[in-house]
Amino acid sequence: MAEFELEVLQPERVFFKDNVEMIVLRTIDGEIGIMANHQPIVVPIGIGKLRIKKDGKWREAAIAGGLLEVKNNKATILSDAVEWPEEIDRQRALLAKERAEKRLEQKLPPDEYERYRAALYRALNRLKLAEENKEEI
């Protein structure tokens, strides 16, 4: 299968950089798959899983939103938070979930409500990915 370059960047590190066969991730409009020679695009990424296929095998990471750019057979992802399942601190994610749920029970201005709703989705995404990959860690 043809490959393309994938680079996943965070403010503090290069999370991933290698040639891959395919990636699948959630945009704000739904799930998208990218393969070699994909048309140029720039799309916002939603909270969810980043699935990477390399050498015929899939690997998943939790991603907390960001931006995807594809051009010239290269995909670049910019995100504040991307984690492999083994990097996820389950206890910290559980505390973040509980904190967000508690705040969402209160009457909040719309901007604060959206911030805590996103925090809840991030925590749930991290917990789900960690649970699904518990046996592999």
Curated annotation (Swiss-Prot):
Localization terms from the record: Cell membrane
Predominant cellular place of this UniProt entry's protein: membrane
GO cellular component: plasma membrane; proton-transporting ATP synthase complex
Record's function text: Produces ATP from ADP in the presence of a proton gradient across the membrane.
Name of the gene this protein is made from: atpC
Protein name listed in UniProt: ATP synthase epsilon chain
InterPro entries: ATP_F1_dsu/esu_C_sf, ATP_synth_F1_dsu/esu, ATP_synth_F1_dsu/esu_N, ATP_synth_F1_esu_C, ATPsynth_dsu/esu_N
Subunit annotation: F-type ATPases have 2 components, CF(1) - the catalytic core - and CF(0) - the membrane proton channel. CF(1) has five subunits: alpha(3), beta(3), gamma(1), delta(1), epsilon(1). CF(0) has three main subunits: a, b and c.
Gene3D superfamilies the UniProt entry points to: ATP synthase delta/epsilon subunit, C-terminal domain (1.20.5.440), F0F1 ATP synthase delta/epsilon subunit, N-terminal (2.60.15.10)
